[in-house]
C-alpha cells in the first residue's frame, strides 16, 4: 500500500503544485482539501504517513488542526499510537509563529510559500519513499525527432 499524504491548504494552485510534485517524485498518494474541518474528517477516515498543513486555514488554524488530530488519530486507527509527522506550510509573516510551535517532536519542518520543489523534496526525504526509477515530471522537447 502506498504511503498517503494529507494536504490542507486554501490555495488551489499551491495544492496542485504540491500534489503534482509529490506524486511525481515520491511514491505516494495525496489527498488535498482547502479547509481544516474536511482535513480532520479525512484524517480520522484513512491512515496517513504525513500531514502538510498551512498555518492559516478556513474554519480552523493549521496548528489547532494538528493538535486535534494528534489526540483523535490513535483512537480512530486501532494499533496506531501517534499521529503521523507534520510539515507546516507558512508564509513569511508566519515565521515567528512557526518557531513557537516547532518544538513538537512530530513537526518535521516548514515549507515556505509559495512552494519550491527542492525544499519540498528535501523535507519529505526520509518521510516518503522516492519514486521508482527516479520519478520526475514528464520530459518534453520542442526539438523535432531526428532519426
What are these regions (language model features)?
Residues 28, 49-50, 105-111:
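Conserved phosphoryl-transfer motifs of two-component systems
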Residues 12-31:
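Two-component/phosphorelay signaling modules centered on CheY-like receiver
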Residues 32-50:
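Acidic, metal-coordinating helix/loop segments flanking the phosphotransfer/catalytic sites
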Amino acid at each position: 500500500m502506498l504511503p498517503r499524504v494529507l494536504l490542507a491548504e486554501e490555495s488551489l494552485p499551491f495544492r496542485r503544485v504540491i500534489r503534482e510534485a509529490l506524486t511525481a517524485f515520491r511514491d505516494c498518494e495525496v489527498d488535498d482539501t482547502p479547509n481544516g474541518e474536511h482535513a480532520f474528517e479525512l484524517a480520522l477516515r484513512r491512515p496517513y504517513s504525513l500531514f502538510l498543513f498551512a498555518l492559516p486555514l478556513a474554519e480552523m488554524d493549521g496548528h489547532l488542526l494538528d493538535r486535534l488530530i494528534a489526540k483523535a488519530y490513535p483512537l480512530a486507527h486501532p494499533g496506531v499510537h501517534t499521529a503521523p509527522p507534520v510539515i507546516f506550510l507558512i508564509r513569511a509573516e508566519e515565521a515567528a509563529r512557526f518557531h513557537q510551535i516547532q518544538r513538537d517532536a512530530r513537526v518535521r519542518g516548514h515549507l515556505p510559500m509559495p512552494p519550491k520543489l527542492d525544499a519540498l523534496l528535501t523535507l519529505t526525504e526520509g518521510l516518503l519513499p522516492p519514486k521508482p526509477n527516479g520519478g520526475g515530471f514528464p520530459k518534453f522537447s520542442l526539438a523535432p525527432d531526428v532519426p
